[in-house]
A protein has these predicted regions:
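Basic, flexible Lys/Arg- and Gly-enriched helix-loop patches that mediate nucleic-acid binding at interfaces
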Residues: 2-252
Length: 252
């Protein structure tokens, strides 16, 4: 009987040796027809391990880096995306009045993607996008109490009692129960700037919480969801794929 280590090594070797034609790989990864995949390859825009390939018969493995027009093509499987949402974009596939944040993505099979938690049209910052329903449910389901941290700029001065009241829960208009305890950290009192962490996602919740305290949110920016922090390297409108560590953090 093989040891667990030997079995693991064998599985790894099998994974590396499993080969598939490049045109088949592109069909699966891009949702393209065989004819479309062949055209893409012959264009000269496809590289395998940094070498231009013009034959769909070339075999690739899971360890190969396949790029099309300079962007790595993700292997088959769920996609996990971090987007820096700018002001003026809505988190939906269609909207009759505003741009949808999906126009910022250069992805195939866009219809399979959805937002793991939304932001208001005028709120900026971290948005997570995926085609993995179980993963996004872990973030959005109220029972999991996934923490979200926002940077908030208020119209008026930060009240001395805000932190205590937010920790106790705020009674919101048209809500039967008070909000769950939230934590607040003052960043710059002279600029009415603070960080707020909540563990639920009611409609316009942050804005309504401060309205209930007699203040108004001038600007709102989401910085963190769970242990996933908005990448400082991203500019508004840019995105990247999550690392495996970031993906796995949602389950911890």
């Amino acid at each position: 009987m093989q040891s667990n280590k030997a079995q693991s090594n064998q599985a790894s070797a099998n994974k590396q040796s499993a080969k598939v034609r490049l045109d088949k790989f592109l069909c699966d990864a891009l949702g393209a027809t065989r004819k479309e995949a062949t055209k893409i390859i012959k264009s000269g825009d496809v590289t395998v391990n940094d070498e231009v390939v013009k034959s769909g018969a070339i075999k690739v493995t899971e360890t190969c880096v396949v790029e099309w027009q300079g962007r790595e093509i993700q292997k088959q499987g769920p996609r996990y995306i971090m987007l820096y949402k700018p002001d003026g974009f809505v988190c939906s596939h269609e909207d009759g009045f505003n741009h949808t944040a999906f126009v910022l993505l250069d992805e195939v099979k866009m219809e399979d993607l959805h937002f793991a938690g939304r932001l208001d049209v005028d709120t900026t910052g971290l948005v997570l996008i995926t085609d993995d329903g179980q993963w996004s449910h872990r973030i959005t389901s109220p029972k999991h109490k996934c923490a979200k941290t926002y940077r908030v700029w208020l119209a008026d001065a930060i009240g001395d009692d805000y932190a205590e009241k937010l920790a106790q829960g705020i009674e919101l208009r048209n809500e039967k129960e008070a909000t769950l305890p939230a934590s607040m950290e003052i960043v710059d009192a002279s600029n009415n700037e603070l960080l707020l962490t909540i563990t639920e996602g009611k409609y316009h919740q942050v804005k309504r919480m401060f309205a209930a305290l007699g203040n108004k949110v001038d600007q709102l920016h989401r910085e963190r969801i769970g242990n996933i922090v908005l990448d400082d390297a991203l500019e508004p409108g840019e995105y990247r794929y999550l690392t495996q560590e970031e993906v796995d953090s949602v389950w911890s």
